[in-house]
């Protein structure tokens, strides 16, 4: 069994306090010492918790593979291409939600943007997943669209 840790809420707490406490790089060190297998980081469009500097600092200092959760937008595709994480998970985002409230509706995503993301993820050997509701229809859609894996809501 493998263990992945989502580090986003360390940043949420840090941001609420208005200082660098808790420190993300110290949290990363704890994760590395615990020998976790994957570090999940969700860079939201509104930068609510993790910001760009956090993302690149974590990548630079991490011995753990990064799983980048992101919306399927041009901006996020550019950032992912620059970051070159081991994994990318496409997630839905609504500005007014506190946390992700459901899976991605794969019937409504931009096929043009997905094609662009699939092309560079295959070229760079990045495993691509979709965060979907646990329905046979969505799981089959993910497979048919070319995703490597699914994450279930």
What are these regions (language model features)?
Residues 1-16, 94, 98-101, 115, ...:
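N-terminal small/glycine-rich loop or linker at the start of catalytic domains
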Residues 42, 91-92, 153:
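Short beta->alpha connector loops at strand-helix junctions that form conserved
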Residues 129-153:
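Histidine/lysine/aspartate-rich catalytic loop segments that bind and position anionic ligands
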Residues 12-15, 43-49, 96-98, 104-106, ...:
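Short, small-residue-enriched loops and turns at beta-alpha junctions
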Residues 1-85, 144:
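Conserved N-terminal beta1-alpha1 strand-loop-helix module at the mouth
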Residues 33-37, 116-128:
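A structural motif corresponding to the C-terminal end of an alpha-helix
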